[in-house]
Amino acid sequence: MAKFTNCLALCLLLAAVVGAFGVELSEADKSAVVNEIAEKMALQEMLDGVDKLFLRKMKSSETTLTMFLKEMQLKGLPVCGETCTLGTCYTQGCTCSWPICKRNGLPDVAA
């Protein structure tokens, strides 16, 4: 309904501009303008659907990324995400393993 209202407002604005300046448009010009407006509305409607699809996928992939990072932290894998500066790491629980900081994990078991 909002798109129809936008199109109607745009057509009325076009009619007002044409009427105010006394510009005479031929039937072909009027038809071309109306067709262009209709094409742009159809394109906008298609893009709105694509936006919704991407937003849905982005939310699900963001959730997947969050779950993956939590799982990595629980397993003690390196996810500190910082570079060693003067041999120290600023993130709590991380140690310097040049050139990156790694999360402290369980000690290695001797074979």
Curated annotation (Swiss-Prot):
Cross-link Cyclopeptide (Gly-Asn) residue location(s): 76-104
Propeptide, chain numbering: 29-75, 105-111
Biological-process GO terms, alphabetical: defense response; killing of cells of another organism
Disulfide bridge partners, by residue number: 80-94, 84-96, 89-101
Post-translational modification as stated in the protein's UniProt record: Kalata-B7 is a cyclic peptide.
Keywords tagged on the record: Cytolysis, Disulfide bond, Hemolysis, Knottin, Plant defense, Signal
Range of residues in the leader sequence: 1-28
Function: Probably participates in a plant defense mechanism. Has hemolytic activity.
Family note: Belongs to the cyclotide family. Moebius subfamily.
Protein's recorded name: Kalata-B7
Organism the protein comes from: Oldenlandia affinis
Gene transcribed to yield this protein: OAK3
